A protein has these predicted regions:
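Structured catalytic-domain cores with a bias toward divalent-metal coordination
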Residues: 1-190
Length: 190
């Protein structure tokens, strides 16, 4: 049985459910740390709706220090969505994340950063040509990045699968080389 640690914050006022994931790629520490801190800092008394945080999706990869891969099968989790309930470990994890968390969200933010071998600048993806595109574009406008990519990649990733199923989604890339700074973490939290 798969177990993914998560935090559910229920606001005192009704509203949408926002899902925030990090650690799909397990050595992308900026998003992981930002999600952990958000889970401790968000004030439910001022929150409208719910926030679900999954700070470390790929726990086995994290614990076993595999870069961008699920430890048990060596697969890149963000290339196997929608996954398969009867498949390999990565495929089962992708299937569970989609069915349990993503399908039940009204909006989705997937936090990433450059893994141990990646140098990059902060940017944001959203999927074009979907019913969720307009809302995703409004979400992107709230992200403090200089570059935005309107993607057309429709396979493999969590944010694009969510968008194809009507859940407005963005993927934020911030940080590089599996390193992080306080400034990057604060920017992800904003």
């Amino acid at each position: 049985e798969l177990h993914v640690p998560h935090v559910l914050l229920c606001g005192e006022q009704p509203g949408p459910t926002v899902l925030i994931t990090a650690g799909i790629h397990n050595a992308e520490y900026v998003g992981i740390q930002a999600a952990i801190e958000l889970s401790n800092e968000l004030d439910v008394s001022t929150l409208r709706g719910n926030v679900v945080l999954v700070p470390l999706v790929n726990r086995s990869g994290f614990e076993n220090r595999t870069m961008s891969r699920v430890f048990e099968d060596g697969k890149n989790l963000n290339r196997v969505f929608p996954g398969d309930r009867e498949g390999s470990e990565a495929e089962r994890l992708a299937h569970m994340l989609f069915e349990v968390f993503i399908r039940n969200a009204d909006a989705y933010i997937d936090l990433h950063c450059g893994d141990g071998y990646e140098t990059l600048i902060p940017y944001c993806y959203y999927l074009g040509d979907t019913p969720a595109e307009e809302t995703a574009k409004r979400m992107v406008e709230c992200v403090n990045v200089k570059y935005v990519v309107r993607s057309h990649c429709r396979t493999g990733g969590a944010y694009n699968l969510a968008s194809l199923h009507g859940v407005p989604s963005v993927l934020i890339e911030r940080g590089q080389l599996s390193l992080f700074s306080r400034e990057e973490i604060e920017a992800d939290k904003a």
